[in-house]
Regions:
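Short beta-strand segments enriched in small/hydrophobic residues
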Residues: 16, 53-69, 179-185
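Alpha-helical recognition/docking segments in bacterial nutrient-uptake
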Residues: 56-170, 230-234
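Hinge/beta->alpha junction and helix N-cap segments in small-molecule ligand-binding domains
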Residues: 66-75, 93-102, 147, 156-167, ...
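Short helix-capping segments at alpha-helix termini
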Residues: 86-87, 138, 203-210, 235-236, ...
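Flexible loop/turn connectors
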Residues: 230-314
Length: 314
């Protein structure tokens, strides 16, 4: 039996169970007694690592990032480090390279260390057994960032992917573009699906039909952008919308002068592309606001708040 099972059987949060067992934090005496009586009855023995984490509070935070070469993620991590370092937190970075195997390995490493908080941008959104549940069972607090997950409830800070994508597409339509190609990422990632839905709904709300042949589905990587350029070569599109900057880099790698023929758009603004003077319609992601909201969420969890309603950054 794990602490997750105890929490589920008593219909309480993992954090509440942990506080009752370890005698830390604020908890009602009747709740504490109920927990202690139950664990004694079933013979539950807390994991030694979890006890160590609860009694030896650290200021160690781990960040899981799926692709540090993505300028959005690197800028975001840089801002998070600056924000948290000011508060004397130690930040450890794990780059999972969009690999579930590397993600599992990173989580195993985190579980073996004295880490109290994990900020996770997971590789996928659909898991049969979410790896973060392992960390929660050890008393590690987890906050999802950017990508939500299905069938699990975690604290989280997310971008408004739908609205941003809707506004980009609407702007292109207002500029007179009706034949707009879109390059999306994996359907197993919520942000990709939300951005595609924003694109489709913008067409619908403008009374226009969607040409499914103008949707190229791939991955959040440069290769997808390169393949998409070949795909759209004879599609007579006038605008091309990449749902992340890695895809856009692939588009430009295939044809650096493509912007002379097509109106380019990207969900995430890229500093390098902007510095090169390439005109791209894009959302400016408020990484400073995201890092401050993450810090605020972490402080609330430290103060005993076990669940924070997911926060949407517009």
């Amino acid at each position: 039996m794990t602490i997750v099972d105890v929490a589920k059987n008593l219909n309480l949060s993992i954090a509440t169970i942990s506080r009752a067992i370890n005698g830390t934090g604020k908890i009602k005496e009747e709740t504490k007694k109920r927990v202690l009586d139950y664990v004694k009855e079933v013979g539950y023995t807390p994991n030694a690592i979890a006890i160590n984490l609860s009694k030896q509070k650290t200021r160690n935070i781990a960040i899981l990032v799926p692709n540090i070469t993505n300028s959005f993620f690197s800028n975001l991590v840089n801002e998070i480090c600056k924000t948290f370092n000011k508060k004397k937190y130690n930040v450890m970075l794990y780059n999972t390279s969009e690999s579930r195997d590397l993600e599992r390995e990173a989580i195993r490493n985190i579980a073996a260390q004295r880490v109290n908080f994990v900020i996770a941008i997971l590789v996928k959104s659909n898991y049969t057994n979410n790896p973060l549940k392992r960390l929660q069972s050890l008393g590690v607090n987890c906050i999802l960032l950017d990508r939500d997950v299905e069938n699990y409830t975690f604290n989280g800070v997310f971008l408004d992917n739908y609205s941003g994508s809707y506004e980009i597409t609407k702007r292109l339509l207002e500029e007179g573009h009706k034949n707009i190609g879109i390059i999306t990422g994996e359907s197993t990632i919520t942000s990709s699906n939300e951005r595609l839905k924003g694109y489709k709904d913008a067409f619908k709300d403008c009374g226009l039909n969607i040409d499914e042949n103008n949707i190229f589905k791939g991955k959040f990587n440069i290769e997808t952008g390169e393949k998409a350029v070949e795909y759209f070569k004879n599609r007579n599109i006038t605008a091309l919308y990449s749902v992340n900057n890695q895809i856009l880099l692939g588009v430009l790698k295939k044809s650096l002068e493509i912007n002379k023929h097509l109106r380019l758009a990207c969900f995430e603004e890229d500093d390098v592309i902007r510095a090169l003077g390439i005109d791209v319609l894009a959302c400016k992601i408020p990484v400073d606001e995201i890092s401050e909201v993450l810090l605020q969420s972490l402080e609330e969890i430290k103060d005993g708040k076990t669940y924070i309603k997911p926060i949407l950054i517009k």
